């Protein structure tokens, strides 16, 4: 089992959600976050003064998936979230030691 964490542009969330649902992913967690990478930030004018905006709005999504669909899901996220411009984001894949469904007590892949 793997935990996929992806940082994407906010306007890509619905497309990514649909793409992974089409593969069979039944659950996703999305969080509004701020960050920067190579994109850095940008400057804005406010009341005649220039300000540097370092942190840009992004969306972090987290999905627990079975190893059997890992590559499909990662590929779907990358292809769907890509705009070809700086700031498209990143995908991180981590091992999951255990998953427990609180309601039923199911564990492992059955709990995903």
Identify the residue ranges that each predicted region occupies.
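Positively charged, small/polar-rich N-terminal and surface patches that mediate targeting and assembly
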Residues: 1-112
């Amino acid at each position: 089992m793997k935990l996929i964490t992806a940082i994407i542009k906010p306007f890509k969330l619905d497309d990514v959600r649909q793409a992974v649902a089409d593969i069979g992913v039944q659950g996703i967690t999305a969080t509004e976050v701020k960050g920067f990478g190579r994109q850095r930030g940008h400057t804005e004018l406010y009341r005649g003064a220039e300000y540097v905006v370092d942190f840009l709005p992004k969306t972090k999504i987290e999905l627990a998936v079975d190893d059997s669909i890992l590559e499909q899901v990662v590929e779907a996220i990358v292809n769907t979230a890509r705009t070809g411009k700086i700031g498209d984001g990143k995908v991180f894949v981590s091992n999951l030691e255990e998953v427990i469904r609180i309601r039923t007590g199911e564990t492992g892949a059955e709990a995903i």
